[in-house]
Amino acid sequence: MDKAEMVSLDIERGAALLDALDRAKLKVGVALWAHLAEYDDWRLVVSARRFDSLDLRDAYGLLIDSLDAAGFTPRTTPPVMILPMADPFVRELRRRFAKTKSVEGMRLGGQMIGDRFVQDGYVYRIE
């Protein structure tokens, strides 16, 4: 199946979501849109130490509560995937790009990163 293209509306929606998480003081360390080989669509991948301190269900609950407070609805919330900061994918992203001055807007694709094959990606933040 052909992968859907990333459009500016998705990029803006991802930026608004990240802004909402920043306002909720979640200190997101990694945020990017990723079209991963194991899924057939785009996912907004986020990682934060605050999520790591919770079990996955509570982490998604915190995410949803933070987005709800910012006015996001189930209809306007993009598909989000929370990964631990220790996940091999996140660790490899941080190893490769954390010292890069500006990663916002960087495109990734056609490569293995950690244990995941990234078909395409749009980066907001890697710290």
What spans do the regions from the language model cover?
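Catalytic "initiation/cleavage/transfer" segments centered on a nucleophilic residue
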Residues: D65, T73-E127
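A short interface-forming secondary-structure element
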Residues: V45-R57
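Short secondary-structure junctions
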Residues: D19-G29, G71-P74
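Short, non-transmembrane amphipathic alpha-helical segments
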Residues: L54-R75
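N-terminal presequence-like segments and adjacent domain-start helices
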Residues: M1-R13
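Short, internal active-site loops enriched in acidic
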Residues: A37-Y39, R49, M85-F89
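Short edge beta-strands and adjacent turn/loop segments
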Residues: K25-W42
